[in-house]
Amino acid sequence: MTKGILGRKIGMTQVFGENGELIPVTVVEAKENVVLQKKTVEVDGYNAIQVGFEDKKAYKKDAKSNKYANKPAEGHAKKADAAPKRFIREFRNVDVDAYEVGQEVSVDTFVAGDVIDVTGVSKGKGFQGAIKRHGQSRGPMSHGSHFHRAPGSVGMASDASRVFKGQKMPGRMGGNTVTVQNLEVVQVDTENKVILVKGNVPGPKKGLVEIRTSIKKGNK
């Protein structure tokens, strides 16, 4: 069955395995995960738990900042006897009977050796050209060439008379939801509520990440 938790990417470090192997790891801090709602096949058509992460400030009239919860969010969290949450995500195909509304989901949900998928929002790079954004080749930089880093031809002859959708061109790069699959949990620190994940995960430092059981290898 699927397991899941939300956390913040703290950064990268390294640890040593039992055989002395150096392992690069990403530190993910996962605090304040609370089950806000349980969904079942009978009522909702599928099994899932809804998990909230990081508290929001209580409802305040005329508050314009998104740091404050609105009344519907406050009422929804109140059913779980919890504070309103800033981030709410669903984890499907879980053992619903193993969770209760209001229960805290801790890092010991995972153990060392678990294979997981990690989802985050990639770092934003701003407006970039076709070489950096798509890995296209540049032209000659000397010998009279006037073609250096331009994207080259993007259109067709008079038969098509248009640029096809999806043509690789300069534009905004990064800031996309990215999932890295089949990463390994190296260590779980229940005292500091952190998970050490082998390799790197998407997003900047302090970015939100979603950790769940690997969809390909988790149930094998």
From Swiss-Prot:
Record's keyword terms, sorted: Ribonucleoprotein, Ribosomal protein, RNA-binding, rRNA-binding
Gene3D superfamilies assigned to the protein according to its UniProt record, in alphabetical order: 3.30.160.810, Translation factors (2.40.30.10)
Gene Ontology, cellular component aspect: cytosolic large ribosomal subunit
Gene Ontology terms: biological process: translation
Region annotation (Disordered) ranges: 130-156
Molecular functions per Gene Ontology: rRNA binding; structural constituent of ribosome
Disulphide bond pairs: none
InterPro entries: Ribosomal_uL3, Ribosomal_uL3_bac/org-type, Ribosomal_uL3_CS, Transl_B-barrel_sf
NCBIfam families in the cross-refs: L3_bact (TIGR03625)
Function, as annotated: One of the primary rRNA binding proteins, it binds directly near the 3'-end of the 23S rRNA, where it nucleates assembly of the 50S subunit.
Family indicated by similarity: Belongs to the universal ribosomal protein uL3 family.
Self-association state and partner proteins as the record states: Part of the 50S ribosomal subunit. Forms a cluster with proteins L14 and L19.
Full protein name: Large ribosomal subunit protein uL3
Organism expressing this protein natively: Staphylococcus aureus (strain NCTC 8325 / PS 47)
Gene, per the UniProt record: rplC
